Amino acid sequence: MAAHRRRLALIIHNVRSAHNVGSMFRTADGAGVEMIALSGYTPVPPEHGAVAMTAAQKSFRKTALGAEASVAWKRFRTAAEAIGFFRKEGFG
């Protein structure tokens, strides 16, 4: 009998350090997280192929090691909005 597998999501809310956010992306990628929600003042990854980046985006890219390309992510104003989105999308 096949085991039921839950869909995993991660909400990163009000984490100031781009280095820490990049590390969370890398860890989420390894753990099989399907989607990451970024909310509050949490920094977002740089655009794909971006050349001009802020110091925070450079720090993110250095620690994420490309995980932002393999884990879907979405920006939300609040963590509550992210929770509502994940509930509607069937994350448990």
Where are these regions (language model features)?
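RNA substrate-binding interface of SAM-dependent RNA methyltransferases
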Residues: M1-G92
